[in-house]
Regions:
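Conserved active-site and cofactor/substrate-binding residues in soluble primary-metabolism enzymes
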Residues: 2-3, 24, 28-32, 79, ...
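A conserved regulatory-domain signal marking ACT and ACT-like small-molecule sensing domains
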Residues: 112-222
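Substrate-binding/catalytic subdomain of NAD(P)-dependent oxidoreductase enzymes
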Residues: 1-74, 79-81
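Short secondary-structure transition/capping segments
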Residues: 35-44, 91-99, 165-174, 217-222
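Generic structural hydrophobic/aromatic packing signal, biased to beta-strands
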Residues: 37, 44-46, 61, 82-84, ...
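Catalytic, metal-anchored helix/loop core of enzyme active sites in primary metabolism
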Residues: 51, 57-153, 158
Length: 222
């Protein structure tokens, strides 16, 4: 989150305080989520995401599902990567080791040498471009896709009710996977939505009747 605050400030020429970065860890993620996501062609990554649209900026760190063919899906182990998408550069990714004794020591020594040999005054363009016009987007205003892992009552009409609750908040279903029945009368149902407003998806989930289905987990999809 600290790195995201710095990088977003530099990239967007705006003040992006660390305190304004949304942070969510991986404690709610289970092996079941990872397995189902893999079946649907996705991998799970803990991503730091910064986006700018017009005069609004969103910054967030959370577990995210990305498609198997996304460049970031192959970044593993001690490697870190920065994936960029811009109007002129289109798609670009920078990758390298970001952990371990030697990579870390090399980066620290490089910074020390740079500070000792280069004028380290902050570039005035950055200082003066605090971009008072830019505003941070709050959680409820994000727009992304969502992976929903549900446990539903295995009876006629359950799917129709779920679709109705989602559509009532303008949330549409992109793809769905229902697993074979487990012990009891409930079955796992996996839904990936089209892009939706975060406030809308939460409002829709609040309408779910626990007698029909329960939400086991919700993961954002990029």
């Amino acid at each position: 989150a600290y790195k995201l605050s710095i990088m977003a400030s530099l990239a967007f020429h705006a003040r992006v305080p660390f305190s304004k970065v949304y942070r969510e860890g991986i404690t709610k993620i289970t092996a079941v989520d990872i397995a189902y996501a893999r079946e649907m062609g996705y991998v799970l990554k803990l991503l730091a995401i910064a986006k700018r649209s017009g005069n609004t900026i969103e910054v967030r760190v959370h577990p995210t599902l990305i498609a198997n063919d996304h460049p970031l899906s192959q970044v593993n182990g001690s490697f870190n990567a920065v994936y960029l998408h811009g109007h002129a550069c289109k798609e670009m990714m920078l990758q390298g080791r970001g952990a371990g004794d030697l990579p870390t020591a090399s980066a620290v020594v490089g910074d020390i040498l740079h500070a000792a040999t280069v004028d380290v005054h902050v570039h005035p363009t950055f200082v003066n471009s605090a971009n008072a016009d830019a505003s941070l987007v709050f959680t409820n205003d994000w727009k992304t896709r969502y992976f929903l892992r549900l446990s539903i009552q295995d009876e006629p009409g359950s799917l129709a009710k779920i679709a109705t609750w989602l559509s009532s908040e303008q949330v549409s279903i992109a793809t769905m996977m229902q697993k074979a029945e487990l012990a009891g009368s409930r079955v796992p149902l996996i839904i990936i939505t089209h892009e939706a407003n975060e406030q809308a998806i939460r409002a829709a989930l609040a309408k779910f009747d626990p007698e029909v289905c329960t939400v086991e987990n919700m993961i954002r999809v990029e």
